[in-house]
Amino acid sequence: MENKAMYLHTVSDCDTSSICEDSFDGRSLSKLNLCEDGPCHKRRASICCTQLGSLSALKHAVLGLYLLVFLILVGIFILAVSRPRSSPDDLKALTRNVNRLNESFRDLQLRLLQAPLQADLTEQVWKVQDALQNQSDSLLALAGAVQRLEGALWGLQAQAVQTEQAVALLRDRTGQQSDTAQLELYQLQVESNSSQLLLRRHAGLLDGLARRVGILGEELADVGGVLRGLNHSLSYDVALHRTRLQDLRVLVSNASEDTRRLRLAHVGMELQLKQELAMLNAVTEDLRLKDWEHSIALRNISLAKGPPGPKGDQGDEGKEGRPGIPGLPGLRGLPGERGTPGLPGPKGDDGKLGATGPMGMRGFKGDRGPKGEKGEKGDRAGDASGVEAPMMIRLVNGSGPHEGRVEVYHDRRWGTVCDDGWDKKDGDVVCRMLGFRGVEEVYRTARFGQGTGRIWMDDVACKGTEETIFRCSFSKWGVTNCGHAEDASVTCNRH
């Protein structure tokens, strides 16, 4: 190292701009060249500061510098930990600079501690100055790295804020889309259930219409047979009447011709009768005169009966009369009554139950319905064998106790029965529970009105031999995919 003349100043000789009062930073490290550039050099160039160059003061200055750098590093680490993670390259560069700075301070401390008390102070000061100059460069590089790291941290923080905002916006949009999708799914489920109900109702109506059309077809076939018979008989009667009318027309024409001839004969006979009457009148007058004369002559003559005269000759045979008019044929008799229908054939075997369809998606929980009216007071408890059926099942909204909507009692509440798989076997069990002989008809689709409250039973499948409907096969209590538009009903046989 180049030897330089070094003049030390005393503490009292230094003014306000000396190293004694200036703040210590990386740019003022050159002030350790104490007697070279200071203002005391102008005043007293030949006097040195013997007290400032002491080794203890130098150690205290180095320790203060070390403590200051340590505090700066602690603040940098706290800032780095409290902010988002920076890039790996910047962190590696910062770590290398900190390690190098620590090693430099450690070497400096070891040198100061191991330096002899009587060594060349000037040589040691120059070494310390070079070390501090190197540390100043390292601190400047470290400050630049820290500034770059701080800029990167601020950029990362801004990006993190933007990312959080984008994530929050995406979360809100996702939540809105999820709510919208759930609402649309619920609406689709409601529409699907309504469509299924309508399809079942229309299927029932179509079945009834098909049965009515079949009955109407049979009635039309019967009417067609009757009409064909009437048409045949009427055609025969019309032909017969046409023939009779033709005969009557011929007879009328013949009768009119005979009438004309009779009229002519009558006119001639009338003239002849007039002439004969005139002649008869004249003869009668002559006979009257002669009779008067004879009567006078015969008064004096006694009358005596003479012998019979001879038999006269046989008269001529009269002309043969005309044949009479043929009589009209009698009317055709009415067709006989329709025969009685034959005995009905034996009832066919019931078909096999179809396979159970897949269970649909469970719908959303509906709103709680209004509180129902207070039910009627039940009968007093008694023998279980005689009270179980009336207390556990009833028929509602019918014209009498023999018909209505089927309701069962469970969990201290009345509920309805779904009509899925509802048939006469199930109705027989219900009617026997109520004391009737059997079922007359079973109904679906809420024939006697829709119920309220829970639907306790669904997919009921009785064999027809059970004592109660609760021994039949059905889904669990309250487990159903039906609505009250599918409540089951029965009409029991009262006879």
Swiss-Prot record:
Disulfide bonds join 418-482, 431-492, 462-472. InterPro entries: Collagen (IPR008160), SCARA5 (IPR034726), SRCR (IPR001190), SRCR-like_dom_sf (IPR036772). It is a single-pass type II membrane protein. The keyword DNA repair does not apply. Residues 1-60 are cytoplasmic. Residues 91-111 form a coiled coil. It holds the Pfam family SRCR. The chain crosses the membrane at residues 61-81. One of its GO terms (molecular function) is ferritin receptor activity. GO terms for cellular component: cell surface; plasma membrane. Residues 313-322, 364-382 have a biased composition (Basic and acidic residues). Residues 301-386 are annotated as: Disordered. Residues 393-493 form the SRCR domain. Its main location: membrane. Residues 323-341 have a biased composition (Low complexity). It is found in: Cell membrane. Residues 305-357 form the Collagen-like domain. Belongs to the SCARA5 family. Ferritin receptor that mediates non-transferrin-dependent delivery of iron. Mediates cellular uptake of ferritin-bound iron by stimulating ferritin endocytosis from the cell surface with consequent iron delivery within the cell. Delivery of iron to cells by ferritin is required for the development of specific cell types, suggesting the existence of cell type-specific mechanisms of iron traffic in organogenesis, which alternatively utilize transferrin or non-transferrin iron delivery pathways. Ferritin mediates iron uptake in capsule cells of the developing kidney. PANTHER family: DELETED IN MALIGNANT BRAIN TUMORS 1 PROTEIN-LIKE, SRCR DOMAIN-CONTAINING PROTEIN. Homotrimer. HAMAP family: SCARA5. This is Scavenger receptor class A member 5. The lineage of its organism: Eukaryota, Metazoa, Chordata, Craniata, Vertebrata.
